Regions:
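Gram-negative bacterial Sec-dependent N-terminal signal peptides
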Residues: 2-28
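Gram-negative and organellar
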Residues: 29-467
Length: 467
């Protein structure tokens, strides 16, 4: 991997100088600039992060690679609803652009050979529409990303020696699912997330039409699993699209019980025959019946819960024991205002998804808890904790860059502190501890389960100015 210290230091110096100038001229800027109502967001942020393991390796083979990461984050957002007047059906009609320009500097290049550059420019666009007309209400949200990163994926292998050589070591290919996530997110790709709702209310009842999209269009090149590409990560494109209807009944003024139905399709790109002889892939269609509850049972608590059976139909080339299983889907979002200056938020999701590198579909679980405390008007504390799990035990495929029968888990703990010098300028300091762990203890020694365990720590210092 190319060391880009000079370029990064220039970017750091220019960014920090710009923030300093803004800080020095805060009073003058406040007098000269008053944002119109249709410009709710105008900001500039810069952060510096030290990451001690950017590829999430165990250290048994490849040495963990450290890096200094500089992130420049301007942001601008428009809301055109105020221009339409109070009689218009729109409460929100917003568009924003919040890019990140990210530069990696490696103090010592510990890669066993040349890895691709990890620098990237994340061009992020957001669209939000919300309104009502009579008994109808509607909303649309869309988050689109073009990530201008490397078109070459990383290679998880200490060397490219043939297996007959006693020094051969490509065991890092058995890395955790969660070790591979950060470098994959830095690669060249498109992402799109969309959610649309249209609701009609009649007395205590309502009917709601929904649609949702999750799309990953990967632009990285494919390579065979042969030298010099043993351990190279081939990233297939993936998507999930679904639509359906919810029926709701308000058992209390602000609480409703719901019954929903979804029909959806998941797509996983099949690797070309010239790249992989294994012709498996895990595209499927599914139907879900969801039981839920939503609303505010008390003024300090807001919730939205849904869960139920997932009836899955996999394509005939899916490497699973049952092509028509009944699985589970569940999600929850709960937010509590504990006191006037403390809040707690919990998010949960379990669902069936397709693999980002392999063939076997995964059962994906995520539990996230976030606590926030405004100690004073200027000083705030945050504490976040998360557990994620990727379970691939429904499959039988032992081919590919690594056997697919596995269950990986990641634990995250992330405290942070924020101090606001002014309503416009604030500084933040945060720490994140990530621990990956193998959760399938029946994995044979030949699959080197110890290579799935890793620790990754990050420390970040950031400044942001909001005009």
């Amino acid at each position: 991997m190319k060391i880009n210290l000079n370029k990064t230091h220039v970017v750091q110096a220019v960014s920090l100088a710009g923030i300093t100038i803004i800080f020095a001229g805060t009073a003058q800027a406040q007098e000269l600039l008053t944002k119109p109502d249709w410009l709710p967001q105008l900001s500039l942020g810069v952060s510096e992060t030290y990451d001690d393991n950017i590829f999430g390796v165990s250290g048994n083979g490849m040495t963990p690679q450290e890096a200094w990461i500089t992130r420049i984050s301007p942001g601008i957002g428009f809301d055109f609803a105020p221009l339409l007047g109070s009689q218009a059906p729109f409460q929100t009609l917003s568009l924003n652009y919040t890019p990140d320009f990210v530069f990696f500097a490696l103090p010592r290049d510990k890669a066993p050979y040349n890895e691709p550059s990890q620098d990237y420019d994340a061009h992020k666009f957001g669209l939000a529409l919300k309104g009502s007309a009579g008994d109808f209400s509607f909303s649309l949200s869309n988050s689109f990303l073009y990530n201008d990163g490397s078109r070459a994926a990383p290679t998880y292998a200490l060397n490219q020696l043939p297996s007959s050589n006693p020094l051969a070591n490509q065991f890092d290919k058995y890395r955790s699912q969660f070790a591979n996530t950060p470098p994959r997110e830095r690669a060249n790709q498109f992402q799109d997330r969309e959610a649309t709702l249209l609701q009609y209310d009649v007395d205590k009842f309502f009917i709601r039409a929904t649609s949702a999209l999750l799309y990953y269009g990967m632009n990285t090149v494919f390579h065979t699993n042969k030298a010099p590409y043993m351990g190279y990560q081939n990233y297939p494109s993936r998507d999930d699209v679904n639509g359906g209807t919810d029926l709701g009944y308000r058992v209390l003024t602000n609480v409703a019980l719901t019954l929903g139905y979804r029909y959806g399709s998941q797509y996983q790109q099949q690797f070309p025959a010239s790249i992989a002889s294994d012709r498996h892939y895990s595209s499927s269609t599914y139907q879900q019946v969801l039981f839920g509850a939503e609303g505010r049972p008390w003024h300090w608590l807001e919730m939205k819960l849904a869960g139920g059976p997932d009836f899955r139909d996999y394509n005939p080339n899916t490497p699973v024991h049952d092509l028509h299983p009944t699985r589970y889907y569940g999600e929850a979002a709960v937010a509590a205002t504990i006191t006037t200056n403390q809040s707690l938020a919990f998010k949960y999701k379990q669902w069936n998804w397709v693999a980002s590198t392999g063939y076997v579909p995964e059962f994906d679980s995520s539990y996230a808890l976030n606590y926030h405390w405004n100690a004073t008007r200027q000083l705030g504390f945050d504490l976040a904790a998360q557990i994620q799990e990727a379970d691939y035990t429904s499959g039988y495929d032992a081919a590919g860059t690594a056997p697919s029968i596995r269950a990986d888990r990641e634990y995250t703990l992330a405290p942070g502190i924020t101090y606001a010098f002014t309503p416009q300028l604030s500084v933040s300091l945060s720490y994140a501890f990530n621990a990956g762990n193998n959760e399938l203890y029946t994995i044979p020694a030949t699959s080197h389960p110890a290579y799935k365990n890793f620790i990754d720590q990050m420390v970040s210092l950031g400044l942001i100015y909001k005009f």
